Amino acid sequence: MSTYAIIKTGGKQVKVEVGQAIYVEKIDAEAGAEVTFNEVVLVGGDKTVVGTPIVEGATVVGTVEKQGKQKKVVTFKYKPKKGSHRKQGHRQPYTKIVIDAINA
């Protein structure tokens, strides 16, 4: 059974394994930089360790592959018979990270 972990980042919990690429909310780091996640909620594998609320001493290390923006989401507000309408677009920034190691 391969080792996996559940980490908290960007207000969400993400299940990660070594070698996996994940997309998370934007992290201020350049492409190629190393990122360490200290908020590890669970480490699983042969022996599962559940944190209360986090696992002490456990870290997940990853490398930033790229920074980007998601596809555009368009919102449109319209009031009939008033000639009022409003169109707005938004692109959420993200960071793509490749997981290098899970240290428990």
UniProtKB/Swiss-Prot annotation:
One Pfam family from the record: Ribosomal_L21p
Which InterPro entries does the record cross-reference, listed alphabetically?
bL21-like (IPR028909), bL21-like_sf (IPR036164), Ribosomal_bL21 (IPR001787), Ribosomal_bL21_CS (IPR018258)
User: How far does the signal peptide extend, from start to end residue?
Assistant: none
**Keywords per UniProt:** Ribonucleoprotein, Ribosomal protein, RNA-binding, rRNA-binding
Q: Which is a Gene Ontology cellular component entry for this protein?
A: ribosome
Q: List the disulfide bonds.
A: none
Residues forming coiled coils:
none
Q: How does it assemble?
A: Part of the 50S ribosomal subunit. Contacts protein L20.
Family, as annotated: Belongs to the bacterial ribosomal protein bL21 family.
Q: What is this protein called?
A: Large ribosomal subunit protein bL21
